[in-house]
Amino acid sequence: MKKVAFIIPYFGRFNNYFPLFLESCAHNPDCDWLIFTDDRRAFSYPANVIVHYMSFAEMQAMVQSKFDFSIGLERPYKLCDFKPAYGYIFEEYLTGYTAWGHCDTDLIFGRIRDFISEQDIRDYDKIGIFGHCTVFRNDEENNRIFLQPLNGHSRYREVYTDRKNHSFDEEFKDSINTIFESCGKRIRTTEYQANIYTKSSDFRLTSWDPVERCYHNEKLKRAIFVWDDGILSRYWIERGELQKQEYLYIHMQARPMDIRLEKMENVQRFKIIPNTFEALEVEEISVDNFAHIRSKYFNLHYFRLRSKNLWVKIKKKIGLAY
C-alpha cells in the first residue's frame, strides 16, 4: 500500500500511554504520522512519525491563513471541527501521499493495511465516518469537499466562525459526512475498529448502524484485547470455543488507563483490559487457560464520568463553559 499520512495537531500533554500509541504506529511502515505539538518531552519517535513543534498560537495563525474570515479557533479542542479541512490546511505537507487521514492519540493501532488497502483508497473518497480516525483520498477536489454548500448554505463557514464545537468531523448531523453524501461522494461506513462504550466501567463495544444511523452497544462479555507484534486481537469464549477477531484499532475514548508494563518502548506484546495495559500471563491463549487470564481491574470510570458530565452541565448552565 502506498503511504497514508495521518495529521495530528495536539496541544497539551500527551496521555500516559502515548509511547504505546507510537509503538503501534511503528508497526505500520506504510503510513506516516505528522504531529504538530507543543509537548516537547523526549519520546522515542519512530521513523514514520514526524514531529513539528509549534505553539497553539502558531497553529491558530496557520489555520487562520487558509480562510478569508475570522475563525473561532480559541481552544485546542475546537480543532476537531477542522479535521475535515486538514487536507486543505496542511496541503503542503501531503505531496506524494495517496491518502491522508486524521486520528486521535487515545488509540492503539492494529495492522492498518489489513483493513485499508490501495483498492479501498481507489474505490472510496472517504473511509470512515468518525473523528477518532478517518482516511480521505488525497487530491485537490476531495480535499476541498468541506467547502461545498449544504442545503443551500455555507455549513463550513457556519461551523468555523463559531467557537463552540459542532462535531463537524463525524456522524451525519450536518457534518462532513452529510456534505460528502450530498456531493455524491463514496463513503465506506463499514467499521473495523473496537470503539469502547464510554458509559461503562467494562470494555463493551459500541458500533454505528449505517442504516438506522444510531449506535448499538453490545452485551457485556468476558473478553480481552491483545496487541502482539503489530496485530490487535480480541479473545473470548463462546459456546465452549475460543473466539478471536482482529481489529484496525481500539479507541479508548479518553478513558484513563493504568500501565503495568516493565517498559513501553520496543514492547512485543501486551494485554488491554479495563482499565490497564499489562503483560499477557500466558504464551498462547487457549480454552483451557482463558479463565485464568485476568480480564479486568476494579475501576470507577463510570462514576467519574457521571460526575464529570454533571459538572460540565453545571458550568454550561452558569456560563462558565460552552
Annotate each predicted stretch with a short phrase.
Residues 38-93:
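Active-site-proximal specificity loops/subdomain of glycosyltransferases
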Residues 265-322:
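C-terminal non-catalytic accessory extensions
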Residues 11-14, 39-42, 56-59, 106-109, ...:
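Short, solvent-exposed loop/turn segments at secondary-structure junctions
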Residues 145-289:
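Catalytic core and acceptor-binding pocket of nucleotide-sugar-dependent glycosyltransferases
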Residues 83-128:
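GT-A fold catalytic core of metal-dependent nucleotide-sugar glycosyltransferases
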Residues 1-19:
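N-proximal low-complexity "stem/linker" segments adjacent to membrane-targeting elements
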Residues 22-32:
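Short, acidic, metal-binding catalytic loop of nucleotide-sugar glycosyltransferases
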Residues 124-141:
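Short beta-strand-to-loop element that shapes/binds the nucleotide-sugar donor at the catalytic cleft/hinge
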